[in-house]
């Protein structure tokens, strides 16, 4: 019975060796060393040193191979026997017209082979039925008892197996008259049997060579219709394994069998049978049963003609071939194979009725079943693979089979599954194996030295390594190096590309040689090995368990196609070991060691054979084994021995000894065989150079052995020859016609043997000389040169590494060591410094060693002389040590004398101790002397450490204690100083001064105390700097204070002034932050100082634009204070210089902007259709040329921009602040003023807010560049405001303002009259005569529209979207004022200067309205602004409600009297209208509003009015400081000047 997968028990592990680098250098020597251990297991594994990693040298892209196909369950011997049995019994029933259906018993298919075998072992069918032992049969088949399974097995046996067994025994052929029939039928297919599969695996495309694939193809006359309609037959349409790796598919009854047989129809011998029927019966019955199938002969043409011409007689001869009667013709049955007839009741067993379909007679069935099976072998796949494609296929197969990643499948699981699959007849798993790939053709995995490619140094190292499989077979110690031919697989490595389950079957190597396998990479390879001592036992077990296979193929184990479960072998006493070979490991198999295995997954291995000296006896035995099996040899063993014997000096000594032994045996055998030849009477002979003949021309025709020393040939039969062991099998010719062909005469062979003996015995001669020299047997010591000559002879003649050679080398090494020590003694002191001196004991041992060496050494006298000097020195030193007060000088002189001896004398140590004590005491006195320079703490600690190492004495102990006490005190003060330097809580200077003062009394240099001194000095210097800067003429600059704060924080001293400075710096930073929030936009690319100072590059358009783009991209470095004002760092500290520089910057800014306006005005308008890009064309901030609709022109620099790239004003932001706002048709009040981001760099807060910042600035005792720039900006704004108010107060301008006010009031009145219409929906029709009560239309305002329609539109605009406002654009006209040239030009200049200010002033807006009213409305700009405002208009309704609520709260605050806050809110409203731009998201506008509220709070929290700003005490500001009243005398009157009465807003 086959064992389950869980029953597999892994055999024990084989030996594993891990050589050192020294052992790894010589591979064959190491293998010889481990052979006694490893040979007992048959195989072993070797792990090279970790850093031995040869590169993979195969050209992966060009490597292509065709693998073999392996069907796993056809590999195992016992499984193959079962499959063969199923094939035969399936064919038996199919021949009779029945289909085999294997039954299921207890939910598993019935093992018919095991059932048949057990029944046979139990005595046969009749005996079992008689004794009623079917229950025992069921028990042996592992079926449970008590279920009446025995009766079921009996019925299956009777129905399926028993008829087949009867045919096999020939019981039904007792009285059958058989006739010759054609033995060469075309139908040699294995017939189907029904074996259910666990996995339905269709044969792959490469199996078209097999019969399994052929069965998938349609037959000439298919019967598929019956199979498809019959569910039972459909279930049996499955595939199993056969003896030639060919599955058998279940088929319906084959109606074409008769037709197929008719093609080679057998002609019954009708005439002969009629005349002598009984004689033919006797002839056939006299033949052996097993020869029945071979006794028939095919019909000849004459027989066919005879049958044709006597067709009438042939019909009359339809008689039963058993009873020879023709009656009861309705019971006669015609054979479809041979056309013989039988009564159905004459057959054994008799048939109840005429069977339907094809029927064959018993002799045809016997002939078909007795046909011998074809030899089993592997097929080649049809698909060619590369390494990559094969690896992808292999990994995919393994991952799909185990349903997990390939690297996660345990090796134990793969091993159990492999042995389950090969033992299963139910599952048919097919894999591919790239085996026996020639490295000569495809390239080796190891680097190989060749002229095709130059190797790197690393590759060259591995190319010459003995472990390179291309090098190992041809090493000097290897036998195969003496074979000239490149034997593939033996001398030339083979490559193996494996996948999971791909296997190599049980086998031994050719000629029983060694083999070595190296796994280059990939998943492990599992090996099983059997030692050579159990090789015959393994063969016997396999033959005993599967005799059916070995009967037809006696050399089955030599074909590498058969496996057997290691557990089965072990259960029969065969010792088996296993191992998993991982990447980078070697596996070695020993001579005649059977081995097999399989691959765990995708991998790449390389293998080759090699033969050492110990293999020669096994090689000779292998030739005898091959001779018995009549197997061909790979090479001639005799030729190999003779070739090595011809050049004995080139042989390794161990190899020479082994060859001599083999040569001696071979010569003795040759003498015996040639003597037998002479006794037979063969005397003719001729010399033949067998090595020049092809192997197939010198093979023995009997045993297939390759001849070399001699062979027997015949003059009359020149085509063949035999070896001398088969001289009787050559031919039948007379002995006189036979002659001997020989290679060497019997006299030449002993001469070759003698040369080998000399080479083999040369070691004995040399060994005798060495033994005499080492043991001084003749009483004479050899010189060192003589011993060296003996060692050189062993090395040159390659003697083995024996114990005697090792003794010789050890003796030479000892002599060399003694000579080296003697040279150290007698040489100068400089040479002795390199080595440690000898002790007195070692000197005496050296003298004794030199005397005992078997080598004569003349240096022994020098050693004796040194020993005498040492003994005399000992006496003198003892006398000096014994005196009471030895002088230091005497002891030092004796010490130097002892050092010159080169010997370590014990008295010298005592002298050394006393000298060291005196030297150490002297060093301590010098270090602690008052006049000496203070030593460092490290020096004192070093003295203490040195004192602990010297020998103890009263003086030394006292000095050591004093030094220890001093160090303890010093370390305590060092710790205090360290605590002061590192502690988080800093100490005041007075504390530090006290610590330093006390530490001055310690006579040691203390590093931490010195650091504390330095820190205190720095602190005092810092205090002086603070006093100096605080008492100067001006307030200190913020940069100076920050530097002082940074320095003060790093000092380990508590400084009271530091807290004051930190507070001042913090206050200054807070003021700067508030100013930045007030002026700078969100995410502005400008600094506060850049915004407050005049634009230095206002006149350069390209420079200005480039810098702006760089700042937007965060590539621009902000200008420093000195760059902005053009002043040095020293001038910045002078307020007067800052004011002058600011004034100059104003003038440059104005001149630059005028130049820029002229330049930009000359550029073509983007709105013109003919505008083309040129050097004079405007460039937007996005870097592109603005063109077409959606472009805006800056009112300051006159340059053009895309409306989507810049922030644009909201046209109705100031026109409709409330329901009582000015009407829509007052277009001159619309906020259409556009300043580009290059001109409007900040938020431009209102002047009142800035004044609050200035008040906070006066309270700071710190000077900031931004503060002085803000003062200059404020003065500039106030000066401009005064000029603007003066211009607005002139008579002409006042008149114009009155006209605008009148127009505005008129439009407001009209709007109030339309208020009843506000509640009317925009889509409702207007009442008739609704315009009767309306005031008269203002002339020139809407000339083409009547009042009714205009009022309707005005009312609808107030409650609708901007589309209504867009519809009014065509009705606008102007100008509404007549603005004279004399009035307009001054206003435009003021407008220009006001736009340059980064401050919001109401006068600026009034001047803008006057200039707008004095010119026609800019419809193109208005259209552009409306178009840009539309996308965000819907989303702004909700935001408008929230902002309106805030404005109402602000209005309530105004009503309570908070005028300053009201001004700020108005400023925010106007600024909101101008600077809202393209921000369409509600969050952005609300954030901006909150930031502006923060700016307002700065002003509100100050709680000051204008009068408080004017009442600054000049005495509180230092002389020439940057105060408001000191620097800006014009500030006071301008702040209190009232606004004009004509307030348009």
Swiss-Prot record:
Biased segments, Polar residues type: 199-210
EC number: 1.14.11.67
Record field: compositional bias (Basic residues): 1436-1449
GO biological process, one term: regulation of DNA-templated transcription
Residues engaged in binding Fe cation: 507, 509, 595
SUPFAM superfamilies cross-referenced by the UniProt entry: ARID-like, Clavaminate synthase-like, FYVE/PHD zinc finger
Zinc finger motifs (PHD-type), residue ranges: 317-367, 1177-1242
Cofactor names: L-ascorbate; Fe(2+)
Residue ranges annotated for the JmjN domain, each copy included: 14-55
Keywords, sorted A to Z: Chromatin regulator, Dioxygenase, Iron, Isopeptide bond, Metal-binding, Nucleus, Oxidoreductase, Phosphoprotein, Repeat, Ubl conjugation, Zinc, Zinc-finger
Compositionally biased tracts (Acidic residues): 1483-1494
Quaternary structure (record): Interacts withPCGF6, MSH5, ZMYND8, AR.
Family: Belongs to the JARID1 histone demethylase family.
Cited function: Histone demethylase that specifically demethylates 'Lys-4' of histone H3, thereby playing a central role in histone code. Does not demethylate histone H3 'Lys-9', H3 'Lys-27', H3 'Lys-36', H3 'Lys-79' or H4 'Lys-20'. Demethylates trimethylated and dimethylated but not monomethylated H3 'Lys-4'. May play a role in spermatogenesis. Involved in transcriptional repression of diverse metastasis-associated genes; in this function seems to cooperate with ZMYND8. Suppresses prostate cancer cell invasion.
Name under which the protein is recorded: Lysine-specific demethylase 5D
């Amino acid at each position: 019975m086959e064992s389950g997968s869980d029953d597999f028990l892994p055999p024990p592990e084989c030996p594993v060796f891990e050589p050192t680098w020294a052992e790894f250098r010589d591979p064959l020597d190491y293998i010889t060393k481990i052979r006694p251990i490893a040979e007992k297991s048959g195989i072993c594994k070797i792990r090279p040193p970790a850093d031995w990693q040869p590169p993979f040298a195969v050209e992966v892209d060009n490597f292509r191979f065709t693998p073999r196909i392996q069907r796993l369950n056809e590999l195992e011997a016992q499984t193959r026997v079962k499959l063969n049995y199923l094939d035969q019994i399936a064919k038996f029933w199919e021949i009779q017209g029945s289909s085999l259906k294997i039954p299921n018993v207890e939910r598993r298919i019935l093992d018919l082979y095991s059932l048949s075998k057990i029944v046979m072992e139990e005595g046969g069918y009749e005996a079992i039925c008689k004794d009623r032992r079917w229950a025992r049969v069921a028990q042996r088949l592992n079926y449970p008892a008590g279920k009446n399974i025995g009766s079921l097995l009996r019925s299956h046996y009777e129905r399926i197996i028993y008829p087949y067994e009867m045919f096999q025994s020939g019981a039904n052929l007792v009285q059958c008259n058989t006739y010759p029939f054609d033995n060469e039928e075309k139908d040699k297919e294995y017939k189907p049997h029904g074996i259910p599969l666990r996995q339905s695996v269709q044969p792959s495309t490469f199996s078209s060579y097999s019969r399994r694939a052929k069965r998938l193809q349609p037959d000439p006359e298919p019967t598929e219709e019956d199979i498809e309609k019959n569910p039972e037959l459909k279930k049996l349409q499955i595939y199993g394994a056969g003896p030639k790796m060919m599955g058998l598919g279940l088929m319906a009854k084959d109606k074409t069998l008769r037709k197929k047989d008719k093609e080679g129809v057998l002609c019954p011998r009708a005439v002969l049978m009629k005349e002598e029927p009984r004689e033919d019966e006797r002839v056939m019955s006299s033949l052996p049963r097993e020869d029945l199938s071979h006794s028939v002969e095919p019909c000849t043409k004459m027989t066919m003609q005879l049958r044709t011409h006597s067709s009438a007689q042939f019909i009359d001869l339809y008689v039963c071939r058993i009873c020879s009667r023709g009656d009861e013709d309705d019971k006669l049955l015609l054979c479809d194979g041979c056309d013989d007839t039988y009564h159905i009741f004459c057959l054994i067993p008799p048939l109840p009725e005429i069977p339907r379909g094809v029927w064959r007679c018993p002799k045809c069935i016997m002939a078909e079943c007795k046909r011998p099976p074809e030899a089993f072998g592997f097929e080649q796949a049809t698909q060619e693979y590369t390494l990559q494609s094969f690896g992808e296929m292999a990994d995919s197969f393994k991952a799909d089979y185990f349903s997990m990643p390939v690297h996660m499948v345990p090796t134990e699981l793969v091993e159990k599954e492999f042995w389950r699959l090969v033992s299963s007849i139910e599952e048919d798993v097919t894999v591919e194996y790239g085996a026996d790939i020639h490295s000569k053709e495809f390239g080796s995995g190891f680097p190989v030295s060749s002229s095709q490619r130059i190797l790197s140094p690393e590759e060259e190292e591995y190319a010459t390594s003995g472990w390179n499989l291309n090098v190992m077979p041809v090493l000097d110690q290897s036998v195969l190096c003496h074979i000239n031919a490149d034997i593939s697989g033996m001398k030339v490595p083979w490559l193996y590309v494996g996948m999971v389950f791909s296997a190599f079957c049980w086998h031994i190597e050719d000629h029983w040689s060694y083999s070595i396998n190296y796994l280059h990479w990939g998943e492990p390879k599992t090996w099983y090995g059997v030692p050579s001592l159990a090789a015959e036992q393994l063969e016997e077990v396999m033959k005993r368990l599967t005799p059916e296979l070995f009967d037809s193929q006696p050399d089955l184990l030599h074909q590498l196609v058969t496996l057997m479960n290691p557990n089965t072998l072990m259960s029969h006493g065969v010792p088996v070991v296993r191992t998993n070979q991982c990447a980078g490991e070697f596996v070695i198999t020993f001579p005649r060691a059977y081995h097999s295995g399989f691959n765990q997954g995708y991998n790449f291995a390389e293998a080759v054979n090699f033969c050492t000296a110990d293999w020669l006896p096994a090689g000779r035995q292998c030739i005898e084994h091959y001779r018995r099996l009549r197997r061909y040899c790979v090479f001639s063993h005799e030729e190999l021995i003779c070739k090595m014997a011809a050049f004995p000096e080139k042989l390794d000594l161990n190899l020479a000894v082994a060859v001599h032994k083999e040569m001696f045996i071979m010569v003795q055998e040759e003498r015996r065989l040639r003597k037998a030849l002479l006794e037979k009477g063969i005397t003719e002979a001729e010399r033949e150079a067998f090595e020049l003949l092809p192997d197939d021309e010198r093979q023995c025709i009997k045993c297939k052995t390759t001849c070399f020393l001699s062979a027997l040939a015949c003059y009359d039969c020149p085509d063949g020859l035999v070896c001398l062991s088969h001289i009787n099998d050559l031919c039948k010719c007379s002995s006189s016609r036979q002659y001997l062909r020989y290679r060497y005469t019997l006299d030449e062979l002993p001469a070759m043997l003698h040369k080998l003996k000399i080479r083999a015995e040369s070691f004995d001669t040399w060994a005798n000389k060495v033994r005499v020299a080492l043991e001084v047997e003749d009483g004479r010591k050899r010189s060192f040169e003589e011993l060296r000559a003996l060692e050189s002879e062993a090395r040159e003649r390659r003697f083995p590494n024996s114990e005697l050679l090792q003794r010789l080398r050890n003796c030479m090494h000892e002599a060399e060591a003694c000579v080296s020590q003697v040279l150290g003694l007698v040489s100068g002191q400089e040479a002795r410094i390199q080595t440690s001196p000898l002790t007195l004991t070692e000197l005496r041992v050296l003298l004794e060693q030199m005397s005992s060496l078997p080598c004569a050494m003349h240096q022994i006298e020098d050693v004796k002389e040194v020993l005498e000097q040492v003994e005399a020195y000992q006496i003198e030193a003892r006398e000096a040590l014994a005196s009471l007060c030895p002088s230091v000088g005497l002891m030092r002189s004796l010490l130097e004398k002892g050092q010159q001896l080169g010997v370590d004398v014990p008295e010298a140590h005592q002298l050394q101790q006393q000298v060291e004590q005196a030297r150490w005491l002297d060093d301590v006195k010098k270090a602690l002397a008052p006049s000496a320079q203070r030593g460092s703490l490290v020096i004192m600690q070093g003295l203490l450490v040195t004192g602990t190492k010297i020998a103890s004495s009263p003086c030394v102990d006292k000095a050591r204690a004093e030094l220890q006490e001093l160090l303890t005190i010093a370390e305590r003060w060092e710790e205090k100083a360290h605590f002061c330097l590192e502690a988080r809580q800093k100490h005041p200077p007075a504390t530090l001064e006290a610590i330093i003062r006390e530490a001055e009394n310690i006579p040691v240099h203390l590093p931490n105390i010195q650091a504390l001194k330095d820190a205190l000095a720095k602190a005092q210097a810092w205090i002086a700097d603070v006093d100096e800067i605080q008492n100067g003429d001006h307030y200190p600059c913020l940069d100076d204070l920050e530097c002082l704060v940074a320095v003060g924080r790093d000092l380990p001293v508590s400084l009271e002034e530091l807290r004051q400075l930190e507070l001042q710096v913090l206050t200054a930073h807070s003021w700067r932050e508030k100013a930045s929030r007030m002026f700078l936009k969100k995410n502005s690319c400008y600094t506060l100082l850049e915004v407050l100072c005049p634009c230095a590059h206002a006149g350069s358009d390209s420079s200005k634009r480039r810098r702006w783009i760089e700042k937007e991209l965060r590539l621009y470095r902000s200008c420093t204070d000195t760059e902005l004002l053009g002043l040095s760092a020293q001038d910045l500290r002078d307020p007067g210089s800052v004011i002058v520089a600011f004034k100059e910057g104003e003038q440059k800014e104005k001149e630059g902007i005028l130049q820029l306006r002229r330049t930009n005005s000359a550029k073509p308008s983007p709105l013109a259709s003919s505008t083309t890009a040129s050097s004079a064309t405007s460039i937007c901030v996005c870097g592109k040329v603005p063109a077409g609709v959606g472009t805006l022109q800056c009112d300051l620099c006159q340059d053009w921009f895309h409306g989507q790239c810049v922030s644009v004003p909201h046209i109705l932001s100031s026109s409709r602040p409330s329901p009582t706002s000015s009407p829509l048709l007052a277009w001159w009040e619309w906020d259409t003023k556009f300043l580009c981001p290059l001109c409007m760099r900040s938020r431009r807060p209102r002047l009142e807010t800035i004044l609050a910042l200035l008040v906070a600035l006066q309270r700071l005792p710190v000077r900031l560049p931004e503060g002085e720039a803000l003062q200059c900006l404020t003065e500039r704004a106030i000066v401009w405001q005064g000029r603007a108010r003066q211009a607005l107060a002139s008579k002409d301008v006042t008149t114009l303002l009155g006209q605008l006010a009148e127009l505005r009031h008129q439009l407001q009145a009209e709007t109030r009259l339309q208020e009843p219409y506000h509640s009317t929906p925009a889509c409702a029709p207007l009442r008739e005569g609704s315009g009767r009560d309306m005031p008269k239309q203002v002339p020139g305002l809407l000339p083409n529209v009547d009042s009714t329609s205009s009022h309707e539109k005005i009312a609808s605009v107030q409650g609708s979207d901007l589309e209504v406002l867009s519809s009014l654009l065509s009705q606008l006209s102007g100008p509404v004022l007549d603005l004279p040239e004399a009035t307009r030009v001054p206003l435009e200049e003021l407008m220009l200067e006001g736009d340059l200010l980064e401050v919001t002033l109401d006068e600026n807006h009034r001047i803008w309205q006057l200039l707008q009213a004095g010119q026609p409305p800019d419809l193109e700009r208005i259209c552009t602004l409306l178009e840009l405002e539309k996308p965000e208009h819907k989303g702004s309704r909700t935001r408008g409600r929230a902002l309106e609520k805030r404005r109402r709260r602000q209005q309530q605050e105004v009503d309570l009297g908070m005028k300053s806050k009201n001004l700020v809110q108005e400023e925010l409203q106007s600024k909101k209208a101008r600077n809202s731009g393209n921000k369409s998201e509600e969050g952005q506008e609300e954030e901006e509003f909150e930031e502006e509220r923060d700016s307002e709070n700065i002003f509100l929290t100050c709680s000051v009015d204008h009068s408080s700003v004017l009442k600054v005490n000049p005495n509180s500001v230092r002389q020439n400081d940057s105060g408001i009243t000191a620097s800006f005398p014009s500030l006071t009157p301008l702040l209190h000047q009232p606004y004009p009465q004509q307030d348009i807003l």
